[in-house]
A protein has these predicted regions:
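Catalytic core of non-heme Fe(II) oxygenases with the double-stranded beta-helix
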Residues: 84-183
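Non-heme Fe(II)/2-oxoglutarate
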Residues: 1-91, 117-118, 124, 131-145
């Protein structure tokens, strides 16, 4: 059951250049376990609660009336900035595990390559289990423990179990919000 429709909003931030410049001023680290490509900043709730709250409210307002919600609505959210350079060409199909209800991605790269973005994927054949050894190659690949050739072979092997359903291009200041349990890359 999908909790939210895939939603795309252009012009997400009122001052995207300011947000981008702030993001680039922060320290970002790669994940030690290789859970994601590139590097991420610390949780925005800890380093800039005002921006974090503004962003969460803006996302929530895409689906619910939040004008009077300050007194009685609470949420748990985690967010930060992720920096991925152009050498990372294609993603690994995955879903966000855990209790997350939805995922939001806001693109802040001006003049991004038109082939980049986020796609929603579907399992090709639900009767086929993806072999564990294929799924388990993602983390060593993102930790650069595999050669680029072996990492690409592993990514293609995993992604072959899925078919692209929706594609959202990377456009400056565009947000995509979707159910966290949907497969995406």
């Amino acid at each position: 059951m999908m909790l939210l429709p895939v939603t795309v909003v252009d012009g997400f931030f009122d001052e995207p250049d300011d947000v981008r410049n702030y993001a680039l001023s922060l320290t970002a680290e790669p994940d030690a376990e290789g859970k994601w490509p590139g590097s991420r900043t610390a949780n925005l709730a800890e380093i800039n609660p005002k921006l974090f709250d503004h962003t969460c409210r803006r996302i929530a307002s895409m689906f619910w009336d939040t004008r009077d919600a300050q007194e009685f609505v609470q949420w748990q959210a985690q967010g930060g900035f992720q920096l991925v350079d152009s050498s990372y060409q294609s993603g690994w199909v995955h879903h966000d595990a855990g209790e997350e209800l939805f995922t939001a991605i806001i693109y802040l790269t001006p003049d991004a390559d038109a082939s980049t973005g986020t796609s929603i994927w579907e399992v090709r054949d639900r009767a086929v289990d993806i072999p564990k050894h294929i799924k388990d190659q993602k983390f060593p690949a993102l930790q650069q423990q595999l050669s680029p050739e072996d990492a690409e072979e592993a990514r293609l092997a995993l992604n072959s179990y899925y078919k692209e359903s929706i594609r959202v291009n990377n456009k400056y200041n565009r947000a995509i919000v979707f159910d966290s349990h949907l497969y995406h890359a």
